[in-house]
Regions:
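P-loop NTP-binding core
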Residues: 1-243
Length: 243
């Protein structure tokens, strides 16, 4: 969702956007960054500037953002970055460093999007400490409710301890299909956290997978209009909640 949101804000809304990739897999970085074509026809991202893992240092000599083809700026994470995975072992006070280093830079942007791993750990804490709002995209499964409860408890804990202005926008149902299992999981969430569910949902749509994998806006795909409509509805609802 973060990748399509970056495209939407930068290209459709013409906003000044910074994306901070805090997921060690680096998928957002590889899709947004400039790319070069390899001999086998595949592509590899050209990653420059400050890495997300470097933000955890106590001292940092300036931050260099990367300019992406879509118009957004990016602080990147290389694919499966061991340096960022290692940040899970740092002392809790070190997770406060990115917020300290980035505060001034954030002032230059209309929106800052932080892509976070779904796991509860230092990277999530670091992201929540410097956020104004948080939205949780959730894939439905038998464990969706357990996962959401754990995540919400962490968010509330971080809010109480470090960032009392943090606002929980809610839960976005992502990649939903018409199966009995998904329907059951959705009903379970509706019973557990009814006030937190976004009205709009993103269904399982192959064009959205294709667009995200290829690093292009879903609305640019000829056959992607249904997926594009759903993504746009969710993003508009999100922007409305942010106000």
């Amino acid at each position: 969702l973060c990748i399509q949101q970056a495209f939407y804000l930068a290209l459709q809304k013409k906003k000044k956007v910074l994306v901070l990739d805090m997921d060690g897999q680096g998928n957002t970085s590889s899709r947004l960054a400039p790319r070069r074509e390899l001999e086998d026809g595949d592509y590899e991202p050209i990653l420059t500037g400050t890495k997300t893992a470097e933000l955890f240092a106590y001292e940092l000599d300036g931050i260099e953002v990367m300019h992406c083809p879509c118009g957004a700026d990016l602080i990147h994470t290389p694919k499966n970055d061991p340096d960022l995975f290692e940040m899970e072992a740092v002392p809790l006070d070190q997770a406060m460093n990115p917020a300290r280093h980035l505060a001034e830079l954030f002032e230059n942007y209309d929106y800052v999007l932080i892509d976070c791993p779904p796991s509860l750990g230092r990277k999530l804490v670091a992201a929540l400490v410097m956020s104004t709002h948080v939205a949780c995209p959730v894939k439905l499964s038998g464990f969706a409710v357990d996962g959401v409860e754990g995540l919400l408890n962490t968010i509330i804990g971080v809010r109480e301890a470090y960032n009392q202005d943090l606002e929980i926008l809610g839960i976005v149902i992502n990649d939903m299909d018409r199966s009995v299992n998904h329907d059951k999981a959705l009903k379970s969430l509706e019973n557990t956290v009814p006030d937190l569910l976004f009205e709009n949902k993103i269904m399982h749509r192959p064009p959205l997978d294709t667009a995200t994998t290829d690093g292009i806006p879903v609305w640019e795909l000829r056959y992607g209009h249904v997926a594009a409509k759903e993504v746009e509805a969710v993003l508009e609802e999100l922007l409305e909640k942010v106000g």
